[in-house]
């Protein structure tokens, strides 16, 4: 198995441009061997910048309170569940503001999307701008592979930015000196440039067979992203073609037979195999397209940056007094095996079996229950899927005092109907154990360890192609793709007559929970409804002119997410969203620092009234140009 070796990664020092003076002694000279002039002279130098792009992309999922949490809670599938904090993202209109601290400890990392995006763009643009500084004689394929990967990284970032923030600054070249003159650029033209770049990349980026390493960008990853961009542009035939380039490449196939470390264990199944971290990078896993690779040897990135996914998305089941027995005693503890609680050692190791969660990503009742329509669906069956009733009361004090509820299943209510869980938001919900359980042998209270994570997977490619067919009113083809994913999980196929966007989004939620950037994808679909004017499954039509006040993203969230629909009360806030939050606010810090240009603010936020017409990208020589509309 080949993995990207990014041990001891040398972070590059980007030199500023030199002075205009002509005296030779005033010309800046690199003070380091690793200055750009010395680094970007061959494939190894350019790949070092691309490795930095991969590293920054991985940061979305890894560490505590990863930015990805925001993609979950600004959607129909989940809400922020840490009820013991202030400043968290529950009452969205009150806290989602341009000058709010969006990168704050264990409260939120939403702001990382803006800063990390432009870091990745910086690294990609260095490669793009300097690619021909090297001698590529007899190495044209290597040059084009590297350039194509840089185009991929830049396009991937902008695909996310335009569905999080809308119109944003579009930077197409290496910035070699201070600049304060950026302007917002139209989402549509940014996507057009991304499409052009990805079409180049789809031609030249290597396949795995041609030498692409596990964890690096390959041709299939390019075509997968190109499919999303084609959808976003409303170019549905092109989306089908780019999805076909992955699905029909002869290499990638949905996994339907057991494989990996537990393939002979009859208590598990193909769904379990597919999501075990030790199986994701295996050669026989033909469903993997692009994988974030993580191991304890990657010390250059900080050993603490584990995939702390159980901490984020498993309930806070072991909190003190969170789940009481019918006899009124503390029922559960997340202390490890042998640790004393109340003077007695823990004998039932729940934390080792399920992980220590804090309930930050709290799935909605719809995701837990209403979404699932087939009892044979492996994704919603034990032991892949866990309910709180699968846990038992393990507090050793119960055993020591002869309490009859020791080792009995945890209960939500007592015989009289009284609640036994003191925090039903944070400490009581179901979860997809098969996907979220990532062991950490170095931690006796594991909350997620060093593990690989899917960035792109073939199941999503099928669902993207199904979506393109739906936009073209080809329900027969859409049903075939949805059912390919669905029947692999043991669920019955949908009849063609029942298939629509609601069904498609439901299947995405079942298959891609904590994989897809749910907010981004819902916003992309909202834009398509506004652009095409097609009638939605909810009976509504949408327009671009009213996007900030009436859009599909908001309607979908209100339809499926009872917390936002009913303004559920938490200890410090009510859960609320608003239509304009379909786009996040451009940070005030970015706007204020840009004193010689103008960054527009989105509707609904302070500063919107000072907006000016955004610029647009037009095709032309080199990277094209950013011009006034």
Where are the language model's segments positioned?
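Bacterial Sec-dependent N-terminal signal peptides
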Residues: 17-41, 155, 194, 227, ...
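C-terminal substrate/ligand-recognition segments
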Residues: 351-485
């Amino acid at each position: 198995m080949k993995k990207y070796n990014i041990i001891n990664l040398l972070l590059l020092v980007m030199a500023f441009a030199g002075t205009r003076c002509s005296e030779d002694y005033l010309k800046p000279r690199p003070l380091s061997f690793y200055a750009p002039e010395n680094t970007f002279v061959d494939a190894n130098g350019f790949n070092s910048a691309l490795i930095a792009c991969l590293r920054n992309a991985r940061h979305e999922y890894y560490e505590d309170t990863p930015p990805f949490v925001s993609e979950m809670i600004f959607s129909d599938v989940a809400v922020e569940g840490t009820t013991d904090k202030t400043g968290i993202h529950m009452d969205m209109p009150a806290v989602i503001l341009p000058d709010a601290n969006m990168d704050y400890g264990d409260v939120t990392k939403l702001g990382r999307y803006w800063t990390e995006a432009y870091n990745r763009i910086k690294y990609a643009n260095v490669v793009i701008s300097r690619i021909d500084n090297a001698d590529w004689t007899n190495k044209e394929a290597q040059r084009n592979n590297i350039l194509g990967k840089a185009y991929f990284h830049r396009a991937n970032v902008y695909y996310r930015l335009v569905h999080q923030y809308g119109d944003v600054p579009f930077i197409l070249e290496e910035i070699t000196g201070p600049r304060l003159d950026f302007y917002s650029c139209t989402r549509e033209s940014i996507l057009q440039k991304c499409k052009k770049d990805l079409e180049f990349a789809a031609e030249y980026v290597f396949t795995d067979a041609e030498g692409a390493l596990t964890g690096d960008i390959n041709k299939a990853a390019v075509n997968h992203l190109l499919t999303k961009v084609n959808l976003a542009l409303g170019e549905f035939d092109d989306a089908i073609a780019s999805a076909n380039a992955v699905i029909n490449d002869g290499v990638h196939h949905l996994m339907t037979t057991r494989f990996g470390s537990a393939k002979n264990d009859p208590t598990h199944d193909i769904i379990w195999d597919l999501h075990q971290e030790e199986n994701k990078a295996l050669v026989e896993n033909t469903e993997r397209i692009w994988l974030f690779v993580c191991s304890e040897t990657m010390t250059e990135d900080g050993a603490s940056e584990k995939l702390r996914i159980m901490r984020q998305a498993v309930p806070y089941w072991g909190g003190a007094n969170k789940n009481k027995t019918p006899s009124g005693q503390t029922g559960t503890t997340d202390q490890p095996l042998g640790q004393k609680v109340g003077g007695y050692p823990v004998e039932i190791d729940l934390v080792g079996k399920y992980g220590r969660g804090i309930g930050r990503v709290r799935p909605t009742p719809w995701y837990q229950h209403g979404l699932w329509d087939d009892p044979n669906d492996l994704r919603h069956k034990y032991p892949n899927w866990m309910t709180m009733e699968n846990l038992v009361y393990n507090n050793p004090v119960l055993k020591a005092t002869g309490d009859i509820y020791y080792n009995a299943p945890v209960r939500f209510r007592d015989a009289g109907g009284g609640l036994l869980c003191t925090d039903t938001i944070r400490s009581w919900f179901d979860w997809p154990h098969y996907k979220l359980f990532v062991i950490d042998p170095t931690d006796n209270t594991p909350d997620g360890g060093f593990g690989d994570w899917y960035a792109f997977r073939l199941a999503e490619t099928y669902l993207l192609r199904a979506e393109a067919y739906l936009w073209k009113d080809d329900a027969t083809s859409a049903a075939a793709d949805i059912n390919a994913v669905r029947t692999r999980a043991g669920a019955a196929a949908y009849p063609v007559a029942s298939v629509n966007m609601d069904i498609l989004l439901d299947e995405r939620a079942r298959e891609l929970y904590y994989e897809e950037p749910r907010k981004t994808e819902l916003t992309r679909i909202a834009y398509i409804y506004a652009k095409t004017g097609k009638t939605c499954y909810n009976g509504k039509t949408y327009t671009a002119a009213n996007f900030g006040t009436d859009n599909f993203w908001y309607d979908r969230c209100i339809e499926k997410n009872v917390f936002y629909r009913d303004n559920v009360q938490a200890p410090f806030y009510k859960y609320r969203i608003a239509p304009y939050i379909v786009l996040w606010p451009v940070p005030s810090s970015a706007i204020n620092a840009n004193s010689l240009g103008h960054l527009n603010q989105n509707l609904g936020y302070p500063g919107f009234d000072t907006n000016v017409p955004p610029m647009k990208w037009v095709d032309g020589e080199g990277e094209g140009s950013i011009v006034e509309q």
